[in-house]
């Protein structure tokens, strides 16, 4: 019998996936990715032999670790586990799973909960940016019950407010990809908003 790997499975925004401590996974990315493919059941359109839901929105992974960066609580690496391919990608970020990083960090004792609300400063490794997630923590415990609604998700839950620091140009290096607020291409003005 295998010993297993601790994992917290939860929804973040309109996605859901597995939240792991980095220390519980292989340090070698190739080994780690093979393990995650197995956990999710990929490649298979139904992911029948794993925990994935046969949809990119339910085949996601958050890897969380304590941070050594000044002023940062935790590091977050997002991985998309492809459903029908034996592939794992860190080429993008996921704001949906980001919303679950703070409650996970509190539940796994990476961050000490405060009375009422706990801010968690998160370094997003995929984009080298910082987000601050605020989690409701009455009695110093995460609450998942609340009246917040989001499109695409039935029911209500506790709101998690997320703010981002210094995100301008995180994907292309500039606020405006071409450096201009308006570009004319083939005689047509394109406004970059």
Describe these PLM feature segments.
Residues 1-193:
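A glycine-rich beta-to-alpha transition motif near the start of alpha/beta enzyme domains, typified by
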């Amino acid at each position: 019998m295998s010993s297993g790997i601790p994992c917290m499975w939860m929804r973040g925004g309109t996605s859901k996936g597995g939240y792991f401590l980095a220390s519980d996974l292989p340090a070698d990315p190739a080994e780690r990715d093979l393990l995650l493919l197995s956990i999710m059941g990929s490649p298979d359109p139904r992911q029948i032999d794993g925990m994935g839901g046969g949809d990119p929105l339910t085949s996601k992974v958050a890897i969380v670790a304590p941070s050594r960066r000044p002023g940062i609580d935790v590091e977050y690496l997002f991985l998309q586990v492809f459903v029908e391919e034996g592939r794992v990608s860190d080429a993008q970020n996921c704001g949906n799973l980001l919303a679950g990083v703070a409650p996970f960090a509190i539940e796994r004792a990476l961050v000490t909960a405060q009375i009422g609300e706990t801010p968690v400063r998160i370094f997003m490794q995929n984009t080298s940016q910082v987000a601050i997630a605020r989690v409701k923590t009455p009695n110093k415990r995460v609450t998942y019950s609340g009246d917040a609604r989001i499109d695409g998700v039935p029911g209500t839950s506790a709101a998690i407010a997320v703010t981002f620091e210094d995100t301008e140009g995180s994907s292309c290096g500039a606020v405006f990809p071409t450096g201009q607020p308006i570009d004319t291409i083939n005689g047509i003005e394109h406004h970059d908003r």
